[in-house]
């Protein structure tokens, strides 16, 4: 991944009201948090669709639908309805009553995949409808299960043995957003179809287990690990596990927490499988049609169902990371019985949980990238890819403005004023640091442009209120990348990069705040000489119709590779096909 190692031309000090367009001489460094530690660029077999065999682990299935519908690159064909995808009447009506008359292309493919019961990995562009794409089928299945349960059993026990869904998000704001979306799907009486609770921030464990728990990894572990009974019953109840923003959750500081949770969930699957195969106790119903999963042979070292020591926890994580390091190459034949690189014998256990991974950016080249880890851990998963994953949306107009220290403020004010003609317009302005956000906001306000300020120095409740006001009233929203990933603000017509993104990943998430849900949008990117390499790489990829992922590479010669990929066909082994729309 190429990073912009520039010093921001926005500065910390105030700008005099008499000269709002002049920049002070002091400049500050921008600190970067590396989202990915390794080079990640996907290999393309060919630009010709007919020749593609393995592109990001996805197969072509319905690409022709986009061409057939012409300019409609968001919605599925008009003949596709919520009910035709397999959803019940209750959920279909709830979606329509919430304003979702038709499924998007993403939803039309991922909903049947999730309803099939298989593990699903959804990698689709921002604003393509991924959240409702996984919520709808999960709510549908949980609703059907709830109808078969006795209400008295649900009320009497805080942890009834029923199916529930666990949704993991990287931060509190995204957790609360998912909760709002679940509560937005209501029945004919206006009541939510299912009970949902957030376990994050100041919100502790619910008194009565809901149908859906939305949590951050750390908050969930803090609430289930200290209490043995809670942990065991909770893990047994979890039927559907969703990892929203999966690329972030599988990298960096989240990785060990996610590994810990997956180990717990998979061990419970192993225990359920053992109980089903034995004649002890009452028989347990296991769906034989659900695929099986490889788990470690732990017969010689049983899982301690009491408290888990730090030493045991670290040992499990080290073993798992060793497994990742020993993963077979991506060229290995799909479905091969030979597990190259695995040191321990593994057994097959019957599946009792479904794992769903959601991401807008998902690099797969490299064993330790998020996509590489998923390809290894969930080899039988269905992969769903958006047509514009890592690409420039055809509904998005991009403007590129190279600026200097003397011209950046004027360019910024002009870009904001050109789009802020009415109070209802929504413009998001991105800067790389908290200090830069404050500097940009000061500049705009001295130019008589009122704006919101959004960054990590605000408390969670303050951020929630700021975001709610912006959603409701519009205006100019100056923010860090805290608002770039996953946050859904409808009708954002313009995104401005006052500081250019530090990586191609950040760039994709920023521009994904506009042109969402089939709408059109504009992105104005201000960049300096220090950003030029990254900008040229992205622009070249966009111009050639290549994924912006080609700009993820750290190597200086990657631009030549972009050109070569248009003419050379890579020699790659055929991988298991999945769904591409």
Swiss-Prot record:
SUPFAM superfamilies: P-loop containing nucleoside triphosphate hydrolases (SSF52540). Residues 408-566 form the Helicase C-terminal domain. ATP binds at residues 124-131. Keywords: ATP-binding, Helicase, Hydrolase, Nucleotide-binding, RNA-binding. One of its GO terms (molecular function) is RNA helicase activity. A motif (Q motif) lies at residues 80-108. CDD domains: DEADc (cd00268), SF2_C_DEAD (cd18787). The keyword RNA-binding applies. Residues 111-380 form the Helicase ATP-binding domain. One of its GO terms (cellular component) is chloroplast. It comes from the Eukaryota. The keyword ATP-binding applies. Its EC number is 3.6.4.13. Belongs to the DEAD box helicase family. This is DEAD-box ATP-dependent RNA helicase 22. The gene is RH22.
